[in-house]
Curated annotation (Swiss-Prot):
Xref: CDD domains: PP2Cc (cd00143)
Protein name (Swiss-Prot/TrEMBL): Protein phosphatase 1H
Example of a GO MF term: [pyruvate dehydrogenase (acetyl-transferring)]-phosphatase activity
Family indicated by similarity: Belongs to the PP2C family.
EC number(s) on file: 3.1.3.16
GO biological process: signal transduction
This protein's record includes keyword Protein biosynthesis: no
Renumbered residue ranges of the record's region Disordered: 110-133
């Protein structure tokens, strides 16, 4: 096993140094190369590229920055720019999509097919959708949707997620659309129940009568349901959060089901934003990042999920289910690899229940390869993958073994909410979404400084200003090709990864409040 792990680590390091086609986030899984693709590879639909332009964009030497040809293709005058990697993989494995979704109440039985009521629009006037409020029950509720997917070990999962995740989101929102329309009434515990309007004196039913189901008891035909036990009050935004979490899970399950019929390679991180009823819901699974820049202030809207940030979750899972380690790994963390000559000595270690460090006596099991190895961007789960949440990766195994890594990976996103109605936003207040290709070389502060320097120098009425701002960020992260590779400010190493950036102006959210 030690030889296999050393080989995996060597392959990874060699890929980084030589710019191999291997992914920074993980190794390749079992491919279905003889199977048809679920969807053909391409760049985001809203870029409006021809096939020739797609091929020209895949120049790993020139690395041309792609931007929107027509700003009306994205709502809110959203800016977008992207660039391919410096040779890490053949294709740009990032994917993006942006749509306006219309959610209508589900009619009839629940089906497993994508929601037909979701209206996909690839070309939208800048002002369209600014008054996104329900007009009637038949029209449902409209919401804006932006997404970024960072693929690894192939673009298959990212392409599929960019085409289908919005359908799962729409489907999950269908059950609650009528509840969301009426913000004055708390969501019922059970769908179909009427809101409680019974006066206080009508709720004095005894516990015995309640259990017998007598007149006035819950479920009796003569009165609305009466609650003997206290119930949690669930706010409306928690329903939306739950819908997004469920949609991510369903998307991951669909990839798992369909990989036997289609070639869906690798996995992907997922970062999405839904603007619904005056609130931004930012859901992230992976190491992409979202920040709001408001009046120069930085407001983080996501967390990154890596072997280091999720160490305790991963260690606890391995502790509870040691068979997942294949008798080849230890769930304990040590400052460095344990050597056989150190058996019987006391060494610093850290377990799932610890944020600090303690000493333990080294045993034979401690000589196994650690579940989490490396630091920072080089940290890996089982020496294989550097991101712990996302979609896909169902066939990913430890190099030259039958140990699956998927049990340690989660599709669950973290969802954060931003209420647009609480602030009056200016033309320079924006939400930045970007894959890790940007954040690997630029800090939140550097991105905020770039935005606050760039936007004030643009005409506030210029519809291209946010696209130009996105282009500026990508250019700052990519840098300039010199004798020693791509270099950015202060002669630092530029990003050799795929980079995708949205710049979403929040001033349009003022009209939704």
């Amino acid at each position: 096993m030690l030889t296999r792990v050393k080989s995996a680590v060597a392959n990874f390091m060699g890929g980084i140094m030589a710019g191999s086609s291997g992914s920074e986030h993980g190794g390749s899984g079992c491919g279905g190369s003889d199977l048809p693709l679920r969807f053909p590879y391409g760049r985001p639909e809203f870029l409006g590229l021809s096939q020739d332009e797609v091929e020209c964009s895949a120049d790993h030497i020139a690395r041309p920055i792609l931007i929107l040809k027509e700003t009306r293709r994205l709502p809110w005058a959203t800016g977008y720019a992207e660039v391919i990697n410096a040779g890490k993989s053949t294709h740009n494995e990032d994917q993006a999509s942006c749509e306006v979704l219309t959610v209508k109440k589900k009619v009839g039985t629940i089906t497993s097919t994508p929601n037909r009521n979701s209206k996909r629009r690839s070309s939208l006037p800048n002002g369209e959708g600014l008054q996104l409020k329900e007009n009637s029950e038949s029209e449902g509720i409209s919401c804006h949707y932006w997404s970024l997917f960072d693929g690894h070990a192939g673009s298959g999962a990212a392409v599929v997620a960019s085409r289908l995740l919005q359908h799962h989101i729409t489907q999950q929102l269908q059950d609650i659309v009528e509840i969301l329309k009426n913000s004055a009434i708390l969501p019922p515990t059970c769908l179909g129940e009427e809101p409680e309007s019974t006066p206080a004196h009508g709720r004095t039913l005894t516990r015995a009568a309640s259990l017998r189901g007598g007149v006035g008891a819950p479920g009796s035909p003569s009165t609305p349901p009466t609650r003997f036990f206290t119930e949690k009050k669930i706010p409306h935004e928690c329903l939306v959060i739950g819908a997004l979490e469920s949609a991510f899970k369903e998307m991951d399950l669909q990839i798992e089901r369909e990989r036997s019929a289609y070639n869906i390679s690798g996995g992907c991180t997922a970062l999405i934003v839904v603007c619904l009823l005056g609130k931004l819901y930012v859901a992230n699974a992976g190491d992409s990042r979202a920040i709001i820049i408001r009046n120069g202030e930085i407001i983080p809207m996501s967390s990154e999920f890596t072997p280091e940030t999720e160490r305790q979750r991963l260690q606890y899972l391995a502790f509870m289910q040691p068979h997942l380690l294949g008798n080849e790994f230890t769930h304990l963390e040590f400052p460095r690899r344990v050597q056989r000559k150190e058996l019987g000595k006391k060494m610093l270690y850290r377990d799932f229940n610890m944020t600090g460090w303690a000493y333990k006596t080294i045993e034979d099991d401690d000589l196994k390869f650690p579940l989490i190895y490396g630091e920072g961007k080089k940290a890996r789960v089982m020496a294989t993958i550097g991101v712990t949440r996302g979609l896909g990766d169902h066939d990913l195994k430890v190099h030259d073994s039958n140990i699956y890594i998927k049990p340690f990976l989660s599709s669950a996103p973290e969802v954060r909410v931003y209420d647009l109605s609480k602030y009056e936003h200016g033309a320079d207040d924006v939400l930045i979404l970007a894959t890790d290709g940007l954040w690997d070389v630029l800090s939140n502060e550097e991105v905020a400084e770039a935005i606050t320097q760039f936007l004030p120098n643009c005409d506030p009425d210029d519809p291209h200003r946010y696209t130009l701002a996105a282009q500026d960020l990508v250019m700052r992260a990519r840098g300039v090709l010199k004798d020693r590779g791509w270099r950015i400010s202060n002669d630092r190493l530029g990003s050799g990864d795929d980079i995708s950036v949205y710049v979403i102006p929040l001033i349009h959210g003022n009209k939704l409040s």
